[in-house]
């Protein structure tokens, strides 16, 4: 358990609920203790048309969890003829984590018929609905920016700048976070994952 705790803390992710959607952002460094094991780790996933997630923790567990969630979302649509709500997805993810062990902390975000929703889940399966979330070892530094700049009335265009600024603050102070950004926004038009060039343009707006 001690090793898993270290794995889960060794990253920084951010999720924001905005007036017109969701912003999800992560940095790209993967570590094994004091070793930088990967400088381009994928910690941001598209689960469905308007649903995404960030992960922190053991890589194999995180990938397995994301695969299971994608499959369950597709099965639900086939069986019920409609999309799974974000609330139901959070409960499903909680039940999967409880059946673990999955040494994973995740942020789930998306848009359903009731609007934009954001959840944080830990390895025990506990889940919390919130509007502004950061996870991982860099989260104290990220929250310093988020608490100063975030409010629920911001747009996703404003939110993506704030999210990357929060990650930048974490990357400056946390040795387990770094090597660039991943960024996605979710609106009524769907989930958009940003390219490196598009992210560079957002960073210029800091």
Predicted features, each with a name:
Residues 104-116, 172-185:
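Conserved phosphate-donor
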């Amino acid at each position: 358990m001690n090793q898993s705790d270290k794995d889960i803390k060794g990253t920084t992710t951010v999720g924001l609920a905005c007036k017109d959607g969701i912003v999800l952002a992560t940095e790209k460094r993967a570590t094994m203790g004091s070793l930088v094991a990967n400088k381009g780790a994928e910690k941001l996933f598209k689960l469905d048309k308007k649903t995404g997630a960030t992960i922190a923790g053991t890589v194999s567990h995180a990938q397995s969890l994301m695969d299971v969630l994608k499959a369950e979302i597709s099965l639900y649509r086939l069986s019920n003829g409609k999309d799974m709500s974000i609330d139901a997805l959070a409960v499903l993810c909680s039940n999967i984590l409880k059946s673990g062990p999955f040494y994973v902390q995740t942020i789930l975000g998306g848009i359903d018929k009731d609007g934009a929703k954001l959840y944080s889940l830990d390895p025990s399966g506990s889940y919390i609905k919130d509007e502004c979330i950061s996870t991982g070892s860099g989260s104290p530094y990220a929250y310093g920016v988020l608490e100063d700049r975030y409010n629920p009335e911001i747009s996703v265009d404003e939110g993506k700048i704030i999210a990357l600024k929060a990650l930048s603050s974490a990357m400056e102070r946390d040795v387990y976070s770094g090597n660039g950004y991943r960024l996605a926004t979710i609106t009524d038009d769907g989930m958009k994952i940003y390219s490196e060039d598009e992210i560079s343009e957002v960073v210029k707006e800091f």
